[in-house]
């Protein structure tokens, strides 16, 4: 909850930033229509986890995916017409690093198995669409970029697919070439937030954007390839509605020309699910269990370029 509180403060601060009255310009920019095409390369690391319980088992199974790194290219579109703002982002990358820690427990809470597997042949993907309004904009002396504050609301689809190979630990070990487990996390989220650009000097400016995620829907498909007592289409399915999260990014930008700008910054995403349901698809039938919680974080620095038409 500490991360959620920090993100809430960021969004509130974006809406309350005071600016000197001398710099205010209540009129819209001279261009009624502005289109900006941008590209980023986001160097990320991530973690995902889920905890499952069942009747008589306060803690049945924990799966933790750690260090699932990816270099994520992003393409983003920004359309501003008078005071209306539209944003779209599309990105994804290949994951070829990381580990899976898989633990199972008895009804008394004792750990009955623990394995560690390597991650490969995985990927991350996201697409988002936001609309909003430019509530304030201004011109600053000795700066070529305008400042602004936008309020935003939108939707994001975020997928993390992981595949674990082999396994070391107890009660058994598996060869490293054998596909052991795959998890496919699919987050669908509503988000609200704000962003600002603050001119500093000449072409230099600072941008900050923050979103709160008040609601999300999560589906996780889990396949256990080495268990003969489970189906593989999938072996388990987790579903939860009502999660919470937040996303924030900050960057320093420099406008090389009136059209071309570069940026360097950092981006952090996190979503945590509400309690949900898990269905285990056995070869002899299905069993209902409880998804206690699932969580995904992805974060890291980025570099980008922007072209304003």
Residue ranges and their predicted role:
Residues 1-33:
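Cleavable N-terminal export/targeting peptides
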Residues 253, 261-263, 273:
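Extended, basic/helix-rich recognition subdomains
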Residues 75-81, 127-135, 142, 153-155, ...:
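Residues on the lipid-exposed face of transmembrane beta-strands in outer-membrane beta-barrel proteins
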Residues 35-43, 79, 88-94, 133, ...:
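Transmembrane beta-barrel strands of outer-membrane/channel proteins
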Residues 24-33, 78-85, 136-149, 200-206, ...:
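Short loop/turn motifs that connect adjacent beta-strands in outer-membrane beta-barrel proteins
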Residues 24-94:
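N-terminal entry module detector
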Residues 45-70, 92-127, 156-189, 214-249, ...:
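Extracellular/periplasm-exposed beta-strand and loop segments of Gram-negative cell-envelope proteins
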Residues 146-148, 185-191, 198-207, 243-245:
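Short gly/pro-enriched beta-turn/loop segments at secondary-structure junctions
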């Amino acid at each position: 909850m500490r991360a959620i509180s920090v993100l809430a403060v960021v969004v509130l601060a974006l809406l309350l930033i005071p600016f000197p009255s001398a710099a205010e310009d209540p009129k819209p920019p001279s261009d009624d229509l502005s289109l900006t095409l941008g590209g980023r390369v986001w160097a990320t690391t991530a973690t995902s986890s889920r905890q499952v319980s069942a009747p008589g088992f306060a803690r049945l199974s924990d799966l933790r995916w750690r260090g699932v790194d990816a270099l994520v290219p992003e393409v983003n579109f920004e359309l501003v017409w008078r005071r209306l703002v539209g944003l779209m982002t599309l990105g994804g990358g290949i994951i070829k690093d990381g580990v899976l820690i898989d633990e199972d427990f008895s009804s008394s809470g004792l750990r009955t198995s623990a394995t560690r597997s390597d991650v490969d042949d995985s990927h991350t993907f996201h697409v988002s669409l936001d609309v909003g309004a430019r509530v304030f904009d201004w011109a600053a002396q000795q700066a070529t970029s305008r400042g602004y504050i936008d309020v935003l609301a939108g939707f994001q689809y975020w997928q993390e697919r992981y595949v674990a190979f082999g396994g070391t630990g107890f009660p058994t070990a598996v060869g490293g070439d054998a596909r052991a487990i795959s998890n496919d996390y699919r987050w669908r989220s509503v988000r609200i937030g704000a962003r600002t650009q603050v001119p500093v000097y000449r072409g230099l400016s600072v941008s900050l954007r923050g979103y709160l995620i008040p609601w999300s829907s999560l589906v996780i498909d889990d396949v256990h390839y080495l268990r003969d007592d489970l189906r593989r289409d999938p072996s388990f399915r987790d579903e939860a509605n009502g999660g919470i999260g937040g996303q924030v990014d900050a960057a320093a930008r420099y406008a090389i020309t009136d059209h071309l700008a570069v940026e360097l910054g950092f981006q952090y995403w996190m979503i945590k699910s509400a309690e949900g349901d898990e269905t285990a698809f056995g070869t002899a039938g299905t069993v209902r269990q409880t998804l206690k919680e699932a969580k995904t974080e992805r974060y890291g620095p980025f570099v980008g370029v922007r072209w304003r038409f």
